[in-house]
């Protein structure tokens, strides 16, 4: 009896999640603690990935939170949350989505918790970052790349 050849199945696994870099600065303290608290929060985020070996990738999620109060920087918090992931038997588009959206979705709660903890340790009111839709950000990135490619070819 002949067995039908089976296509290789996609495999994904988390090998490690770790804190790669962290920084917390409160340049206006202790004067800031005496002012009325009316914060202006700015969040910048970025992702980066690189191949470590065949089918093994490091993904780094960078979050920078800048909080100003009365036009002065109350605090600046930077976190690089990283993970090592194995992703095998994926087509190029699937792999790009995995590294650009799926893995950052896994890393974000860890980065959010680190930021919240640092802010509280700086004795500022707790900061709870809203969830981020990395799938939508990734789709916007793809659309932007397509538009830039079309402009370059025109």
Curated annotation (Swiss-Prot):
Stored InterPro entries: SecB, SecB-like_sf
SUPFAM superfamilies the UniProt entry points to: SecB-like
UniProt entry tagged with the keyword Transmembrane: no
GO biological process: protein folding; protein tetramerization; protein transport
Swiss-Prot/TrEMBL keywords: Chaperone, Cytoplasm, Protein transport, Translocation, Transport
Main subcellular location: cytoplasm
A GO term for molecular function: unfolded protein binding
Location in the cell: Cytoplasm
Cellular component, GO, one term: cytoplasm
A Pfam family: SecB
Function of the molecule: One of the proteins required for the normal export of preproteins out of the cell cytoplasm. It is a molecular chaperone that binds to a subset of precursor proteins, maintaining them in a translocation-competent state. It also specifically binds to its receptor SecA.
Family listed: Belongs to the SecB family.
Complexes and interactors: Homotetramer, a dimer of dimers. One homotetramer interacts with 1 SecA dimer.
UniProt cross-references to NCBIfam families, sorted A to Z: PRK05751.1-4 (NF004393), secB (TIGR00809)
Protein name per the record: Protein-export protein SecB
Species name: Vibrio cholerae serotype O1 (strain ATCC 39315 / El Tor Inaba N16961)
Lineage of origin: Bacteria, Pseudomonadati, Pseudomonadota, Gammaproteobacteria, Vibrionales
Encoding gene, per UniProt annotation: secB
């Amino acid at each position: 009896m002949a067995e039908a050849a089976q296509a290789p199945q996609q495999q994904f696994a988390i090998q490690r999640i770790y804190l790669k870099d962290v920084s917390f600065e409160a340049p206006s303290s202790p004067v800031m603690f005496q002012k009325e608290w009316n914060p202006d929060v700015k969040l910048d985020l970025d992702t980066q990935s690189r191949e470590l070996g065949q089918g093994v990738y490091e993904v780094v999620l960078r979050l920078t939170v800048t909080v100003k109060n009365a036009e002065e920087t109350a605090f600046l918090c930077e976190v690089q949350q990283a993970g090592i992931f194995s992703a095998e038997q994926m087509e190029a588009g699937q792999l790009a989505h995995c590294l650009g959206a799926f893995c950052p979705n896994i890393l974000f709660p860890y980065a959010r918790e680190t930021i919240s903890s640092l802010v509280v340790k700086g004795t500022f009111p707790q900061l709870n970052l809203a969830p981020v839709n990395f799938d939508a950000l990734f789709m916007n990135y793809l659309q932007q790349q397509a538009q830039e490619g079309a402009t370059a070819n025109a």
